[in-house]
Amino acid sequence: MHINVHTHLFTLRTVLTREAVRAMTQRLADAGVPELLVRALTRFLDQQLDRPELLDEREILARLLHELRQVSGFDRFVQDNLARLPFNVVIRGDGLDQLPLETLRSALDQLTTAMAPEDDVRGRPFDIVATLRLAMKGTITEVADHLLEQLEPEDAIVALMMDIRAEDESDRDRRTFRLQMDGTREAALQRPGRVLPFFAVHPGRPNHFELMKKGIDSGAFIGIKLYPSLGYEVDSPELRRVYAYCLEADVPILLHCSHGGFYRDKAFIDYCDPRNWDSVLKGELAELRVCFAHFGGWDSLGTAGGLDEGTWGGTILELMRERPACYTDLSFHTDQMHDPAAEERYFQTLSRLLEEEKLSRRILWGSDSWLLRMEMTEATFWRYFRERMSEEEFRKIAVRGPRDFLGFPEVEPGEEGRTEPAANLQRHLDFLAQNRSQVGSHPSRWVEELTEVAFEPGREPPDWHRRSAPARAIFALARGFMSGGQRNAGFAQARDLRLKELGYWDPRDPNFEGQTCLGLARELIGACEDHGTYAPGWDRNRAIERLHGVFRRGDKRLVQVAGLLDLIFDFERAMV
């Protein structure tokens, strides 16, 4: 079983705040995404924050192109690049939402190609729409499945929550964080043993300690995630209280430790400096399990002097050698891929470090997906490293090290190390065992072996269950238009029915658009009004207009309609 210790499974719905929009678009700009596209993405994300939706690829492309046309400077850009933009008619015309998918894809590709410097391989965001599609999935479990499907059946991922908040956090932003908590816990139950959650701690959140303690004590979460560049120092009294708890409860900590990523202010990037931990990892706290993610950056391994004394990489290396429980990971190390000399140095250095017995347990495998998707897929990242490392080396970073950091028992019989799970992992095993009849799938083999209980998967998918008001509403409406076979198949099978497969779908009927589809939209919205209130940005007229278009096109599945309704309304139980 390989373990990726660094992934993010949150959806836009469960992470997007005003501060998150600012941090995300700043990261895109820092990564070389063209300015016009960054500004269009900012407008797009602001709209999703004000009135969230579930959009498919065609809808995302149409919205992005529409926002590009509204950005100041775009018309001048078009005039200056007419010869390079054969899709000028598309980007100037109306009716973007009616254009075929391939036309929209080609238009965005041509635009981003023209925007990017010819020598900047990172300037053309080929994968930006794929990233948005992944981030706009309806539930955190769906994001987890997207990553897990690219791995071997027993492989596991550590799901790191994120808390990107501002001091003037709104009630909506607070609810967003709670949804991320709920959705991450749900993913652990849906995919027992394959999704291992870490709770995000931000000391600026008034009840951060109570929320963290509840998550850890319950067994749903096995570690905590810190992101100092979001605006807090690691040696604060608030975090020292967190560290004391982590030491007592035997909880590992993973923190962002590179010059890239998200930051509240550029001055806060230095809050991630590993030298800041010299004053923390003393006395009893010297025993803390701490992973300094990213090894300070890819250049620690890929450039001359990257591990010199005083560098972030050099400091992390010193901590791993001298402290009893310090680790690092290789997440989002991609820049060396574009420079053969840097790539050779990178893997030579990594191989040399892994020859040291202590370091062979301290350097961990991580990808930083889904954020990595801006450049490549999870499978591509894994394949790149496995092709350049020996099987023994990869086993050290993807099996031996992660097991040691997370608290697994010894890797091989007779090998020195734990003989029982660490307390953090044992709590998670107890949590899964207590919910053995309420998991979404059969657990990983290691869970069955360490719990010795019989699991009976009976948990419905988080995006389609009978307790969900929107799922019940669209199913009840659709049932009146189902064939006998569709009705007999039942609730679970109805999940993936497309609207156009139902009996109402007849575009040749002169009353189809103005009467049938509009009537269905009104009926469905009325049914939901009985169980929830309109979410910010939505009202009855907007909701009916949106559903009218959905029924008219007929290409969405029932589960997608339920997901849209879950965004339009605030129900007592959200689908995350």
Question: Which residues make up each language-model segment?
Answer:
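Histidine-centered divalent metal-coordination motifs
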Residues: 6-12, 256, 294
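Catalytic pocket-lining loop regions of alpha/beta-barrel enzymes
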Residues: 18-27, 221-223, 233-365
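Active-site gating/metal-coordination segments in enzymes
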Residues: 156, 160-272, 327
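Well-ordered, non-membrane alpha-helical segments in soluble/globular domains
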Residues: 104-105, 122-146, 173-186, 239, ...
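Short catalytic/ligand-binding loop motif for oxyanion handling, primarily in non-cytosolic enzymes
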Residues: 11-14, 165-169, 206-208, 232-234, ...
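Short aromatic-enriched loop/helix-cap "lid" or pocket-rim segments at secondary-structure transitions
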Residues: 14-18, 170-172, 209-212, 265-268, ...
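Mid-to-C-terminal alpha-helical segments outside catalytic/metal-binding sites
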Residues: 1-3, 12, 16-19, 23-146, ...
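Long, low-complexity or tandemly repetitive, helically biased scaffold regions used
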Residues: 473-516, 520, 529-552
